[in-house]
Amino acid sequence: NLDTPYCFYSGDYGG
């Protein structure tokens, strides 16, 4: 998601 530091990693890592 856009509320996580990994949102840009794959697309939806954190949720």
UniProtKB/Swiss-Prot annotation:
The terms under GO molecular function for this entry are:
antioxidant activity
Return the protein name.
Antioxidant protein SmP90
Q: What does this protein do?
A: Has strong superoxide anion radical-scavenging activity (EC(50)~16 ug/mL).
Coiled coil regions, renumbered to chain: none
Localization of this protein: Secreted; Nematocyst
Lineage, opening ranks: Eukaryota, Metazoa, Cnidaria, Scyphozoa, Rhizostomeae
Q: Tell me where it mainly resides.
A: secreted
The UniProt entry's GO CC annotations, sorted and at most eight, read: extracellular region; nematocyst
List keywords of the entry alphabetically: Antioxidant, Nematocyst, Secreted
Misc. remarks from the entry: Has an apparent molecular weight of ~90 kDa.
